[in-house]
């Protein structure tokens, strides 16, 4: 069993994060899943939510992910998201305004996106 896994977090428009990790936690349609080196191969559908990546250097990377797929085999993990952004990139005030606007417009999808962004920031 390898001591680390290679992770690629990719959004539709860009590569968000790439590197070595010891653990990745993501939300799928079947529930939260933690992937460590040596995990059984998997393919799943990502739900909107924060993704936590524990890097090999001991750091933590948090990203807000909005839908997509997760794939793991041979200690290579791919997170292919419709939309993804690192928690450090999220403007909290803008996300809070977007959440309030979505609530007033009764826009459930926009409300869910803003909520995920704020949860990702809260986790970091």
Swiss-Prot record:
SUBUNIT field: F-type ATPases have 2 components, CF(1) - the catalytic core - and CF(0) - the membrane proton channel. CF(1) has five subunits: alpha(3), beta(3), gamma(1), delta(1), epsilon(1). CF(0) has three main subunits: a, b and c.
Designated gene of the protein: atpC
Record keyword Oxidoreductase present: no
HAMAP family: ATP_synth_epsil_bac
Membrane topology category: Peripheral membrane protein
Major subcellular location class: membrane
Molecular function terms, GO-annotated: ATP binding; proton-transporting ATP synthase activity, rotational mechanism
Compartments where located: Cell membrane
Protein name, per record: ATP synthase epsilon chain
Entry keywords, A to Z: ATP synthesis, Cell membrane, CF(1), Hydrogen ion transport, Ion transport, Membrane, Transport
One GO CC term, this protein: plasma membrane
Function per UniProt: Produces ATP from ADP in the presence of a proton gradient across the membrane.
Family designation: Belongs to the ATPase epsilon chain family.
Highest taxon of source: Bacteria
NCBIfam families recorded: ATP_synt_epsi, PRK13442.1
